[in-house]
């Protein structure tokens, strides 16, 4: 379960852009004591992180910048389609040092000993939400019936292409197929990027999208909020040091840095609810 449940920040995005800037500044100040003992000289180590978009868009980039600045250790972030993550973990060159994966894939990675024993950290949950054009009304989607009414009233509801291997797209497609309340929704698959990006380009009225991929377009999109919990439309993610890491000590340092209490507000501001 989430630390906070459905966070108010994600339900009301009117002040989202300013709030995210404030949160980032606050988090960087909070992290300063963590790094007070760190050598600021540049290290010759470069950590390679492999991650799907769900966690790449939910705070990793900001944390990597802070880690590089404070610890002097470079971080390379490689964002991959979910379908390519496991192959890259097992045989990518150079080998990854840190991997972010949904729970089920991380469970398998542990069983197959592709991650270091005891290094797994459960990161958090990113929910599917509804995106509308910035400035458009934000409807009530707090129940399945209300969400269905909003979606059916739209000229088009965009989402990513399930055939691309996107876990997010499969979750959305499965949600719409599994519930009769959504019969009649005018679905439109984005053939060029995310559904939210398509809405931002003017190709549709609204989009179902991971919230972390809505709030990163503050000038074009507004996050109406997450879909109801009963729909099970979310991705829970974990991180671990890989068993092939050339820099396991530094990789463990990054995970400790990225998951200390002072980072909670940054993750939340990017659409990820930290887990207990």
What are these model-predicted stretches?
Residues 9-10, 22, 40:
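Leucine-biased recognition of intrinsically disordered, low-complexity hydrophobic segments
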Residues 17-26:
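Bacterial N-terminal signal peptides that target proteins for export
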Residues 3-18:
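Short, Lys/Arg-enriched N-terminal segments with co-localized hydrophobic residues
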Residues 42-95, 103-112, 121-126, 132-276:
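Exported/periplasmic ABC-transporter solute-binding proteins
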Residues 25-34:
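Bacterial N-terminal signal peptides
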């Amino acid at each position: 379960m989430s630390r906070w449940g459905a966070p108010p920040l994600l339900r009301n995005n009117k002040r989202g852009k300013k709030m995210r800037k404030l949160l980032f500044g606050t988090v960087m100040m909070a992290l300063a004591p963590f790094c007070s003992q760190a050598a600021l000289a540049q290290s010759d180590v470069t950590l390679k992180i492999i991650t799907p978009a769900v966690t790449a868009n939910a705070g990793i980039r900001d944390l990597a910048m802070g880690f590089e600045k404070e610890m002097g250790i470079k971080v390379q972030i490689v964002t991959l389609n979910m379908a390519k993550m496991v192959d890259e973990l097992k045989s990518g060159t150079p080998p990854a040092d840190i991997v972010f994966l949904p729970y089920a894939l991380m469970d398998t990675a542990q069983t197959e000993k592709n991650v270091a024993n005891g290094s797994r950290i459960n990161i958090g949950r990113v929910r599917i939400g509804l995106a509308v054009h910035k400035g458009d009304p934000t409807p009530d989607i707090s129940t399945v019936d209300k969400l269905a009414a909003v979606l059916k009233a739209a000229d088009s509801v965009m989402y990513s292409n399930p055939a691309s291997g996107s876990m997010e797209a499969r979750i959305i497609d499965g949600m719409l197929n599994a519930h009769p309340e959504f019969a009649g929704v005018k679905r439109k698959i984005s053939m060029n990027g995310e559904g939210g990006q398509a809405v931002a380009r003017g190709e549709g009225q609204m989009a179902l999208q991971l919230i972390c991929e809505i709030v990163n377009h503050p000038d074009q999109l507004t996050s109406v909020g997450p879909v109801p919990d009963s729909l099970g439309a979310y991705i829970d993610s974990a991180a671990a040091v890989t068993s092939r890491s050339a820099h396991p000590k530094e990789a463990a340092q990054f995970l400790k840095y990225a998951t200390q209490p002072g980072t909670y507000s940054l993750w939340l501001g990017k659409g990820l609810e930290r887990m207990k």
